[in-house]
């Protein structure tokens, strides 16, 4: 069967203009205009999606099939072009019958041309074919427009659903234009209103806990630039100011070794008067090893030393992925659970803004994993927020899962974040040793977000940074009072 793309090529019908006209009509629709005014950050994200829309429309037109009636008429037209005028006159009754049978828009006009001219001349033959071709072009254009109109309605429906989803989640997850673009891409999934309302709910909870949001932003952007030493690094001059006793005799502050004759201790002067020790005295004088009085003062001088250059290869503000481990034990239920989930949502916001990955692992007696920065991030976030914290505490398995994840090439610069009350058993020595190796050799950072003031110091000693957010009633009341 004839495709619409082939028909457009045969009749020299350009679909590009129709596609562009449809895109402009879609962008000018009242729904999109109001949406862009309300969420200006998402306007760039939608605009960036236009090439994909154009490609989808072209693909739809290219793959569309021409109706059988129009296909038969086009084939008849092509065959008629090859006939001479005498041959065409012989075939004319069959052509008119075919047009009538196919209910062609050109059938009535073709019959009128034939009946109004008693002699069928070559000029009339050319005019017949030209008008027939014009009728086919009109039919092809109409077919293109019908398909584009169907696609426009479908595209507008999809865009409205994505706009509703993105508009609801934009205050929670979109910090900048980059985050808005990624949020728009993630909104392409099939989600119902009741699903993403869970994210909106925790977003409202996060807005009511500004200290929690501030803590997430500080943690997410806390990593400093690191210096990477080079082999055979050149030496550089290093100047420092050092304080040493002044030469002005203000106050005796002790004794020291030196060659100041005026400050010599009496026993040292006594050796000068002994013949056997005279050469020993001069030797110690030359080597500045004579005991002298040390005078107290506030004199400063510049000390010049040399050291290897260690700041040549600087990795400025590395933006690695997050590996977040959340304690789902029973002690983390209630308000702790709400804070932990909201904190992960805040880290997801930071990851979207900085174009980083955010990987969540829930640990109790087992480890459950969620990817919050991939194409299905919204679905994954909803599943994570739907979890209930009712398990036990196995923090060792959490660290082993982190260590295993950091062995991969794509996680070589990851930051680990452990959210817990840290009321658990001590860590095995092999885990502590492996974490220390990752910190020392690969510059991995391990952050602790402590939800309790009663965490075990033996466990928390392993972390580079400890961020405290006490969820006790007293701390909650103090935070509310400070606001």
Swiss-Prot record:
One cellular component (GO) term of this entry: cytosol
Keywords attached to this entry: Chaperone, Cytoplasm
CDD domains per UniProt: VWA_YIEM_type
Compartments, record wording: Cytoplasm
The UniProt record lists the keyword Acetylation: no
InterPro entries in alphabetical order: Uncharacterised_CoxE, Uncharacterised_ViaA, VWF_A, vWFA_dom_sf
Chief location bin: cytoplasm
Function comment: Component of the RavA-ViaA chaperone complex, which may act on the membrane to optimize the function of some of the respiratory chains. ViaA stimulates the ATPase activity of RavA.
Record's subunit section: Homodimer. Interacts with RavA.
Family: Belongs to the ViaA family.
Protein name, entry field: Regulatory protein ViaA
Lineage, uppermost ranks: Bacteria, Pseudomonadati, Pseudomonadota, Gammaproteobacteria, Enterobacterales
